[in-house]
């Protein structure tokens, strides 16, 4: 079985879940790469900015192009899509943090790097990257187990702000909470 990285921002994860998680999408730049992914492949869903594994999607179709908005309310740039079976869909606070030692020390992309090192993140910059089979199997089984157990991994204040897309700013009139769009929501 082949395992592929599927990156989501907190916003696109939220939009996908609200639409039932039956379709996953990628940018038009990944059209050729998507054509090489076959039915029954596994997408391991990784929530960027909070660094958590949050889902398993199994492809039930070949890739196709569809411009209907799913992942953004308008101007959705994730138009190369797959129909998928949402095998595991976790809330962010149930997502598996990559920096948990039992995960970090197992994955080929991270195990030889210090947790504080920024170099590990280079592996998590683009969706559709094929994962080492051993890592894919490990995460697949771990996510299935987490889907059953639903162990909570509490979000930090920072992670909660990222997920809610809110931050506090200080102005001459005092502190104010403001919405911050994800990078993928800015034209």
Q: Where are each of the predicted segments found?
A:
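C-terminal terminal-subdomain/extension
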Residues: 111, 115-155, 169-171
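Short, ligand-facing micro-motifs at secondary-structure edges
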Residues: 52-60
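Residues that flank catalytic or metal-binding motifs in active/ligand-binding sites
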Residues: 2, 53, 80
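Compositionally biased, charged N-terminal/linker segments
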Residues: 1-39, 47, 143-187
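Aromatic- and Lys/Arg-enriched surface recognition patch
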Residues: 59-129
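Short, charged beta-turn/beta-strand-edge "cap" motif at the junction between a beta-strand
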Residues: 46-52
């Amino acid at each position: 079985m082949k395992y592929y990285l599927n990156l989501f921002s907190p916003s696109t994860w939220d939009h996908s879940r609200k639409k039932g998680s039956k379709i996953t999408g990628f940018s038009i730049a990944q059209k050729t790469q998507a054509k090489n992914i076959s039915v029954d492949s596994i997408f391991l869903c990784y929530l960027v900015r909070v660094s958590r594994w949050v889902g398993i999607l199994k492809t039930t179709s070949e890739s196709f192009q569809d411009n209907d908005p799913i992942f953004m309310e308008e101007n959705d740039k994730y138009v190369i899509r797959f129909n998928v079976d949402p095998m595991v869909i976790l809330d962010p606070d149930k997502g598996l943090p990559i920096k948990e030692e039992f995960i970090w020390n197992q994955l080929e992309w991270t195990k030889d790097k210090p947790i504080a090192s920024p170099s590990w993140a280079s592996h998590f910059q683009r969706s559709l990257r094929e994962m080492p089979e051993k890592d894919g199997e490990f995460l697949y089984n771990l996510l299935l187990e987490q889907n059953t157990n639903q162990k909570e991994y509490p979000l930090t204040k920072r992670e909660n702000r990222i997920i809610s897309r809110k931050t506090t700013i200080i102005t001459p009139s005092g502190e104010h909470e403001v919405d911050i769009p994800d990078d993928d929501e800015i034209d």
